[in-house]
């Protein structure tokens, strides 16, 4: 036999992967997990050992039936005999129980693996997941629901037959009946996919696949123009006219080889998708304008690519423009850890002109070169696995999703699971609108036939049939619902010490935003000096300007804290941070941040006040009023402005002033508050430098009881 995975051999022998791994360790055969491979000698040795064990068990139990050469059937049947053994007291009840267990075995193997049954006939040990439905527990224990519920009431718990109980409660109930429960390892969706639906590939089945490329860079540095030049089309112009089929990805051919370009914004390919565990990008093209150099979004793109551990190719664009200085770009890139090959580094740089079409072929050849070095491979002769790039609800087609096939081949008619949705592929079209019957690895296709709209980053998996697809999706939906009810465990300063003590935090990632570059560097250096033997502090991104949506998504993907100095988060960033539970801290003085983090690391953080946002007003005009100074004619865009509130004046994302309201008027009347959608005049106490377009934020400081 050829090399075999641990889980495959375990299935053949009729034992659990965990049991087989323990046996391997007893034999001094080192394996990492259930996906590890075994050579022929080790596999044959195990088969012999387990065959001998089976013969001993069979002779001890004096079974009259002839031993079948396929020992795994005996091993599978034995747990069922115990599980379904008829009780003399109530034979009818067990007949029903037997039927239910039979029905259960017809469902996907997933249920047995995660939540239900794995029995040891000798030791009476049952194995369950982190929780179990009470009805399933009664079947396992071979007891009536009334009997088990009565036991739980005696333990002070009121539960119903369909209620989920945790492992500790289930173990307590089982012990009342002399049965021991073991907790199985909790599997995530990827484990389910690898172990139960689709086996891992053999090295000999893998073939080269086209690379998937994302183009990133600062605004106006020529990302879209470069893609236009690469695809030899004016995509922007055509999309405006509604001609081009936009599915979020496109393909080009060069030297009879294919390259796939993702059209999604570069940062999204690295943040929102990476936060969901999906890696879609193989190579990142970093576009830098030769006349402009490295800019804030360029640095952001570098940090995203580094965090995702993706190879970078630099495209120095606009070399045809006056003032283009390639050496300056290379110098600035080296300052941010990107060392070009010509300067002794390992990052490829290609000078290009998207408008003139200069060196476009050279750039594509470099992509193919990196692809050859990285050896991107997939197995086209297996069930497909892919990832969702975009998804929407179309009035005519229903749910439409753009999927990048990462492994295997997807066919029209395949039953699929996509996150917590499912369906059968009704139709597939490529980036030019052609209908396809099948899609191979690194092909982007638009599919229809899903039950609901999936999220970008969800994994698509082909399964055996519609029933398995539906059951798997429903199970994932239930799991997601349970997870939603729990508070997402993000790192925050308030509980940093506790997480350090429990060993949950080994590295604290920090994103620093400030009003000037000097502050960013000073803060990064000061914070990184705070590292100790329990936790190391690492600044994964630093930039100038307001805290943006992109910063929050990077923090969510990297489990980081955001610290801001003299800057504020945008409205969108604030909303997303609440949803993703990302901790944002803003300061006026650098040392306050250092003291806070230092105090949190030694368990001394005890904040007395919390800032509560009340509302925002946009300054539409500024008037000089005799005796009152400058009054800001404002429109309330969010919440409300209170006369007694503290305020800060924000200009272009930078905090210009913090203070109190001197006057608040509607027409000629003094008022205590003004709500959303109304205009008013706001006088800021002892401050007159108000300009049109400024944002006035009102807030109060609320005491926190700990």
UniProtKB/Swiss-Prot annotation:
Signal peptide: none
Protein name: Translation initiation factor IF-2
Gene3D superfamilies in the cross-refs: 1.10.10.2480, P-loop containing nucleotide triphosphate hydrolases, Translation factors, Translation initiation factor IF- 2, domain 3
Family matches, as Pfam families: EF-G_D2 (PF22042), GTP_EFTU (PF00009), IF-2 (PF11987), IF2_N (PF04760)
One GO CC term on file: cytosol
Domain of life, per lineage: Bacteria
Record region (Disordered): 55-117
Gene, per the UniProt record: infB
Basic residues bias spans: 93-108
Family per similarity comment: Belongs to the TRAFAC class translation factor GTPase superfamily. Classic translation factor GTPase family. IF-2 subfamily.
Chain intervals for the UniProt region annotation (G1): 217-224
UniProt-listed PROSITE patterns: G_TR_2, IF2
Keyword Protein biosynthesis appears in the UniProt entry: yes
Region (G2): 242-246
SUPFAM superfamilies the record matches: Initiation factor IF2/eIF5b, domain 3 (SSF52156), P-loop containing nucleoside triphosphate hydrolases (SSF52540), Translation proteins (SSF50447)
Region called G3, residue ranges: 263-266
């Amino acid at each position: 036999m050829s090399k075999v995975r641990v889980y495959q051999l375990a299935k053949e022998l009729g034992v659990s992967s965990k049991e087989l791994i323990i046996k391997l360790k007893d034999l001094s055969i080192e394996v990492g997990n259930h996906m590890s491979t075994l050579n022929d000698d080790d596999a044959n040795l195990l088969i012999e050992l387990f065959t001998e064990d089976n013969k001993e068990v069979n002779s001890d139990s004096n079974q009259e039936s002839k031993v079948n050469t396929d020992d795994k059937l005996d091993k599978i049947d034995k747990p069922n005999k115990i599980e379904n053994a008829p009780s003399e007291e109530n034979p009818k009840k067990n007949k029903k129980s037997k039927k239910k267990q039979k029905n259960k075995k017809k469902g996907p193997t997933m249920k047995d693996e995660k939540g239900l049954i794995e029995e040891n006939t000798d030791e009476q040990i049952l194995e369950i997941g982190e929780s179990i439905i009470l009805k399933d527990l009664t079947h396992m224990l071979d007891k009536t629901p009334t009997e088990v519920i009565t036991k739980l009431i005696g333990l002070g718990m009121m539960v119903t037959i369909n209620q989920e109980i945790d492992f500790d409660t289930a173990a307590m109930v089982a012990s009342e009946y002399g049965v021991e429960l073991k907790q199985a390892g909790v599997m995530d969706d990827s484990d389910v996919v690898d172990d139960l639906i689709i086996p891992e590939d053999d090295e000999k089945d893998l073939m080269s696949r086209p690379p998937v490329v994302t183009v990133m860079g600062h605004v106006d540095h020529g990302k879209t123009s470069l893609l236009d030049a690469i695809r030899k089309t004016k995509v922007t112009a055509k999309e405006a006219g509604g001609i081009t089929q936009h599915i979020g990805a496109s393909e080009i051919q060069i030297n009879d080889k294919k390259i796939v370009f993702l059209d999604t914004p570069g940062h999204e390919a690295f943040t929102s998708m990476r936060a969901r565990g999906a890696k879609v990008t193989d190579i990142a093209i970093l576009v830098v304008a030769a006349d402009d150099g490295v800019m804030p979004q360029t640095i952001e793109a570098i940090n995203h690519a580094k965090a995702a551990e993706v190879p970078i190719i630099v495209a120095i664009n606009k070399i045809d423009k006056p003032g283009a200085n390639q050496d300056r770009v290379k110098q600035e890139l080296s300052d941010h850890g990107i060392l070009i090959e010509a300067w002794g580094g390992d990052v490829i740089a290609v000078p290009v002109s998207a408008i003139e079409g200069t060196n476009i072929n050279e750039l594509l050849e470099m992509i193919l070169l990196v692809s050859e070095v990285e050896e991107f491979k997939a197995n086209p002769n297996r069930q497909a696995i892919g990832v969702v790039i975009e998804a929407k609800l179309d009035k005519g087609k229903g749910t439409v999703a753009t999927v990048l096939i990462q492994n295997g081949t997807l066919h029209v008619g395949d039953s699929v699971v996509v996150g917590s949705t499912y369906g059968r592929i009704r139709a597939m079209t490529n980036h030019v609108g052609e209908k396809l019957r099948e899609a191979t690895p690194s092909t982007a296709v638009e599919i229809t036939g899903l039950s609901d709209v999936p999220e970008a980053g969800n994994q698509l998996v082909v399964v055996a049939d519609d029933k398995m697809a539906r059951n798997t999706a429903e199970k994932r939906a239930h799991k997601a619902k349970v997870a939603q009810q729990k508070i997402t465990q993000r790192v925050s300063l308030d509980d940093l010490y506790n997480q350090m003590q429990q060993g949950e935090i080994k590295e604290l990632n920090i994103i620093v935003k400030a009003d000037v570059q000097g502050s960013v560097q000073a803060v990064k250096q000061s914070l990184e000096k705070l590292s100790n033997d329990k936790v190391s502090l690492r600044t994964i991104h630093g930039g100038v300007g307001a805290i943006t949506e992109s910063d929050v998504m990077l923090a969510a993907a990297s489990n980081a804290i955001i610290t801001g100095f003299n800057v504020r988060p945008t409205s969108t960033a604030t909303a997303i941070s609440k949803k993703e539970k990302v901790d944002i801290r803003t300061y006026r003085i650098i040392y306050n941040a250092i003291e806070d983090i230092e105090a949190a690391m030694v368990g001394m953080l005890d904040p007395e006040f919390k800032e509560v946002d009340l509302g925002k007003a946009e300054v539409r005009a500024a008037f000089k009023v005799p005796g009152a100074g400058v009054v800001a004619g404002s429109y309330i865009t969010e919440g409300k402005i209170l006369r007694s509130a503290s305020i800060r004046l924000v200009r272009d994302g930078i905090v210009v002033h913090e203070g109190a309201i001197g006057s608040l008027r509607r027409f000629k009347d003094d008022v205590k508050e003004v709500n959303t959608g109304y205009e008013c005049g706001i006088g800021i106490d002892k401050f007159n430098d108000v300009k049109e377009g400024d944002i006035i934020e009102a807030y109060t400081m609320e005491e926190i009881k700990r």
